[in-house]
């Protein structure tokens, strides 16, 4: 086949308009404008775009601007706008923190007016009472221990009461048999052996 025949075959495909809705055709035309429409749009473009002519030449590859502005189109903010937005965000954050602090102070003030802080006072009083009770219990324990010690002493005194302690060896014995007891001890110890408990000379003899 000749190249001419190929071209004829490519361009001889008819697109019957009866199958397409005219509204759809308009939408397609708006989405993909013709080069003539691109040229018209570039003529009526803003002065900022006129300052850069290379955008006109490369406008065919990019999405062209239609005559009717798209309300959903996103325009990126400038640096100043971004700075303003950041400052406003920082201000709102600081205001929120201040408002929270003021609200907490107001709530505390309202609680104090209503008498809720008395709970803290009551807790302090309870703690003081618990400390006093602990001190009292410790004092009672000490008193009890002292009382038991006194009872032990008194019981010891009671036990020692009927039993008379033997007088020291240095002092003379009250009984008249002291001399006899001393002689008996001397006789019990043999003359060759030393007495286990040597008796010092009594002052009575």
Curated annotation (Swiss-Prot):
Subcellular location: Cytoplasm
Region called Disordered, residue ranges: 1-205
Phosphoserine PTM positions: 45-46, 102, 137
Pfam families named among the record's database cross-references: DARPP-32
Compositional bias of kind Basic and acidic residues: 41-63, 167-177
Acidic residues: bias regions: 118-138
GO molecular function: D1 dopamine receptor binding; D2 dopamine receptor binding; D3 dopamine receptor binding; D4 dopamine receptor binding; D5 dopamine receptor binding; protein phosphatase inhibitor activity
Alphabetical keyword list: Acetylation, Cytoplasm, Phosphoprotein, Protein phosphatase inhibitor
N-acetylmethionine modifications at: 1
UniProt biased composition (Polar residues): 89-100
Entry's Gene Ontology cellular component terms: cytoplasm; cytosol; dendritic spine head; dendritic spine neck; glutamatergic synapse; neuronal cell body; nucleus; postsynapse
Modified sites of kind Phosphothreonine: 34, 75
Record's keyword annotation contains Nucleotide-binding: no
Family that this chain belongs to: Belongs to the protein phosphatase inhibitor 1 family.
Record-given protein name: Protein phosphatase 1 regulatory subunit 1B
Species the sequence originates in: Rattus norvegicus (Rat)
Top-level taxonomy: Eukaryota, Metazoa, Chordata, Craniata, Vertebrata
């Amino acid at each position: 086949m000749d190249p001419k025949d190929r071209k004829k075959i490519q361009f001889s495909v008819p697109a019957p308009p009866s199958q397409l809705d005219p509204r759809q055709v308009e939408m397609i035309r708006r989405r993909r404008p013709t080069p003539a429409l691109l040229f018209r749009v570039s003529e009526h473009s803003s002065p900022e775009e006129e300052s850069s002519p290379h955008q006109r030449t490369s406008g065919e590859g990019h999405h062209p601007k239609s005559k009717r502005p798209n309300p959903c189109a996103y325009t990126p903010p400038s640096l100043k706008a971004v700075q303003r937005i950041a400052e406003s965000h920082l201000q709102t954050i600081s205001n929120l923190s201040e408002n929270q602090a003021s609200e907490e102070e107001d709530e505390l003030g309202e609680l104090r007016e209503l008498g809720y802080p008395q709970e803290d006072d009551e807790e302090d009083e309870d703690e003081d009472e618990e400390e006093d009770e602990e001190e009292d219990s410790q004092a009672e324990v000490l008193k009890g221990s002292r009382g038991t010690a006194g009872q032990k002493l008194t019981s010891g005194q009671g036990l020692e009461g009927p039993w008379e302690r033997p007088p020291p060896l240095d002092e003379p014995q009250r009984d008249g048999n002291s001399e006899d007891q001393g002689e008996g001890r001397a006789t019990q110890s043999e003359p060759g052996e030393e007495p286990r408990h040597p008796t010092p000379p009594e002052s009575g003899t």
